[in-house]
From Swiss-Prot:
Organism name: Dictyostelium discoideum
Superkingdom per UniProt: Eukaryota
Coiled coil regions in record: 239-274
Record's keyword annotation contains Coiled coil: yes
Protein name, UniProt field: FNIP repeat-containing protein DDB_G0290639
Length: 616
């Protein structure tokens, strides 16, 4: 029996009372709705609480005794989860507020840059307008002054009428008579003087010349550059996931984000050189790379003997049959290659090896220890474990490989590393070893960060298509030689470290070299066919040796080449030298055989040493 005064509402249906125990569900209490059609306990065996047996209620209580500690544990766990959730959310909220502050601060910087640029342009417009205003004021004042001087001597009668009357009166006198000068004559004499003064001054000529000094300018904006800037603004930020458990997802998301940005801004990605199969006069198949023939090997077909370059592809058969070829120096393993690569299969003596998307797993010893130059081409889809690349390799090229590198993947022997078009694997600190001396970077998709490039690197080249912002610290202070080709993101102050001694802006470089971009550590500067004009102070005073060559065609107006230059080398330049292009007291000028201009216009000091040499 149930006491009437006790509330017995169902937890699922609060307007109904608990009346039954479900015999099929561990004696869980139920109401009439629980057992009705659509209820969770419909057609289950039930026992009424009004007539429940002692054994059933005892069984339920014992079951509850077992369940209750789990409920307590569940509540405690939920409370801990709630606490953790609150802490995480509070941290997220705090970070959200910080992010908003950072966002506002960074965009304020951008707004300030744009405001300064706008003020500078407005200042130029104002200066030009003030000059035009001065010209207008000068002309107006001069002409009005002449008109005022002329008008103040006029009376109500016209000058012509007065002159006619005076001449008629004078003609009545004999030539020898004395003429009595009246007031009209005095007026005419004064007016005559004023007229002669007006005609004899040079104001008219000066004013005509001043008309030519007017400068009516129209401001124009380069929409292509504006669109590039708009697109590149998407590269100035990224989102980092701060959850410790999601680091891998974070890396993947960041890489995908960077890849998308790169794809959006580079629709003309350069691909690895396409390899087409050709047939020579002896009916031997070959492919050509960098104008060199690699004959395609197959054990079932005739093959030229003693070839220095061989390519092995899908279905080529065992490589053991080529071990006799002592001339073999260059090998390609093409897409689909699936033959054994156990140690010793590739013969010693190979010095250059290129590996594409092969199906055979590389093992330690697969690559001979004679290989000094190694390339992993687009599509290579294996993990490069420690020891796969032998310690004989000095030159390593990495294209669009599909597995991330590990610390130790690149051996300490590698001194020259090329990251080629499409390379997209993370470059966490330590991936590139501290033995690398020369690093060449093409149009890669992975984002460089501070620490990606070790301090051991002394020579760096950024090739066409590189499209990342080189913020301060990306290029480490150990680099002393730096080359730029047609990179896509403008350099900023700090992009070039103070350690750079030798700097080259090579063919196609299309960024503005504003003052401060080139650091004061640079002593040797080479300018080739760059696409943007230089400014005064673009070249810092630290530069003592300047080489201008290879079709350079930007104006060399006075002041562009600073007086600090001691030695100037001139090659095949397209721009015309003018007086002041070269500092008059420069110490030495070296002229290449392709230089075809006279230096007379530069009016150089007699002390300047001029000699002819071949530029390198």
């Amino acid at each position: 029996m149930i006491e009437n005064k006790i509330e017995q509402n169902c937890a699922l249906h609060t307007n109904k009372n608990l009346e039954f125990l479900c015999l099929d569900c561990k004696l869980i209490p139920c109401c009439t709705l629980c057992i009705s059609r659509g209820g969770e306990h419909h057609r289950h065996g039930i026992d009424s609480l009004e007539s429940i047996q002692t054994s059933s209620i005892l069984s339920m209580m014992n079951s509850f005794k077992d369940v209750y500690p789990k409920v307590i544990e569940r509540i405690e766990n939920d409370q801990q989860i709630l606490k953790d959730s609150d802490e995480i959310f509070n941290e997220i909220q705090s970070q959200y507020n910080k992010n908003k502050i950072t966002l506002n601060q960074e965009f304020k910087k951008i707004h300030n840059i744009l405001s300064i640029l706008e003020l500078d342009i407005e200042r130029q417009l104002t200066t030009d307008f003030e000059i035009n205003t001065l010209i207008n004021t000068t002309i107006t004042s001069s002409i009005n002054n002449d008109i005022d001087n002329y008008n103040k001597n006029k009376n109500n009668n016209s000058i012509t009428d007065i002159l006619n009357i005076s001449i008629k009166n004078i003609q009545q006198y004999n030539d020898d008579d004395y003429y009595k000068i009246d007031s009209n004559s005095i007026e005419l004499i004064k007016q005559y003087q004023q007229s002669l003064l007006l005609l004899n001054n040079n104001n008219n000529i000066d004013n005509l010349n001043k008309l030519k000094e007017y400068n009516n300018q129209t401001i124009k904006f380069d929409n292509q550059i504006i669109n590039d800037i708009r697109s590149n603004l998407k590269l100035i930020y990224s989102f980092e996931n701060n959850n410790n458990n999601n680091n891998n997802n974070n890396n993947n998301n960041n890489n995908n984000n960077n890849n998308n940005n790169n794809n959006n801004n580079n629709n003309n990605n350069k691909k690895t050189e396409k390899l087409n199969i050709e047939i020579d006069e002896n009916n031997f198949k070959f492919i050509k790379k960098q104008n060199k023939k690699y004959y395609i090997y197959s054990e079932n077909n005739e093959f030229p003997k003693n070839e220095e370059r061989i390519a092995f592809g899908e279905g080529c058969g065992s490589l053991l049959k080529v071990n006799w070829n002592k001339n073999l120096k260059n090998v390609m393993l093409l897409d689909g290659f699936e033959e054994s690569l156990e140690p010793g299969i590739l013969p010693d003596g190979i010095v250059h090896l290129e590996i594409f998307d092969i199906k055979t797993e590389l093992a330690v010893g697969s690559i001979p220890s004679t290989v000094t130059s190694l390339t992993f081409n687009d599509g290579f889809n294996q993990s490069i474990e420690v020891g796969i690349i032998p310690s004989s390799v000095i030159y390593l090229d990495l294209h669009d490989i599909k597995q991330p590198l590990k610390i130790g993947s690149i051996p300490q022997s590698v001194q020259d590393l090329k990251l080629c078009n499409g390379f997209s694997q993370p470059l966490e600190p330590g991936i590139i070893t501290n033995k690398i001396k020369t690093l060449s970077i093409h149009e890669i998709k992975t984002q460089l960060q501070i620490g990606s490039i070790p301090n051991s690197v002394t020579h760096m080249v950024f090739y066409d298509g590189f499209n990342q912002l080189l913020s301060a610290g990306i290029i480490p202070e150990g680099v002393s030689w730096l080359f730029f080709f047609n990179i896509k993101i403008p350099l900023v102050v700090g992009s070039i470290p103070q350690s750079i001694y030798y700097l080259v802006f090579s063919d196609g470089f299309n960024q503005t070299i504003s003052p401060g971009i080139i650091t004061n550590g640079v002593e040797i500067l080479c300018l080739r066919d760059i696409k943007q004009p230089l400014e005064v102070n673009s070249i810092p005073k630290s530069v003592t040796n300047l080489l201008i060559d290879s079709g350079f065609q930007q104006p060399l107006t006075p002041g562009i080449i600073p007086n600090s230059i001691k030695e100037l080398a001139l090659g095949n330049i397209k721009t015309q030298l003018v007086e002041g292009s070269i500092p008059k007291k420069i110490q030495k000028i070296i002229l290449d055989k392709n230089f075809n201009q006279s230096l007379e216009i530069c009016d150089l000091d007699k002390s300047v040493e001029i000699r002819t040499n071949y530029l390198k």
